[in-house]
């Protein structure tokens, strides 16, 4: 588990990364670095480096955000998000609790899940 003060996070994250990862913001669709990337590798938490998703589970969802049908087992945690007037499932890094995005039940086989992730929350470690 990685625990830092908000001041420590502000020292290592850009203002936009801090807004998304620590304050649960959302980057505009089709603007993030990885929404249309096909590079093979492992997508890790931008804040702490914890591996979150493998590139072989990434798919084109048409939403404008990187989307994956499976996380690396036990590396992504889920919480209920009741903000904005509806209930969604928020996803966070299981190591530092950084906000990643949300998971939805409209993804492809084999899981039927769509992990919709902010590019600012990710760092791709290419193979």
Say what each PLM segment does.
Residues 1-2, 6, 10-127:
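A short Gly-Trp-Pro
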């Amino acid at each position: 588990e990685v625990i830092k003060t908000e001041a420590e996070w502000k020292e290592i994250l850009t203002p936009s990364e801090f807004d998304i990862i620590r304050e649960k913001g959302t980057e505009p669709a089709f603007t993030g670095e990885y929404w249309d990337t096909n590079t093979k590798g492992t997508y890790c938490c931008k804040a702490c480096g914890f591996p979150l998703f493998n590139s072989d589970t990434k798919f084109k969802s048409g939403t404008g955000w990187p989307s994956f049908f499976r996380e690396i087992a036990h590396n992504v945690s889920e919480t209920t998000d009741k903000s904005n007037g509806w209930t969604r499932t928020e996803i966070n890094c299981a190591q530092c609790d950084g906000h990643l995005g949300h998971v939805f039940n409209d993804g492809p086989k084999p899981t039927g899940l769509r992990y919709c992730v902010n590019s600012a929350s990710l760092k791709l470690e290419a193979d």
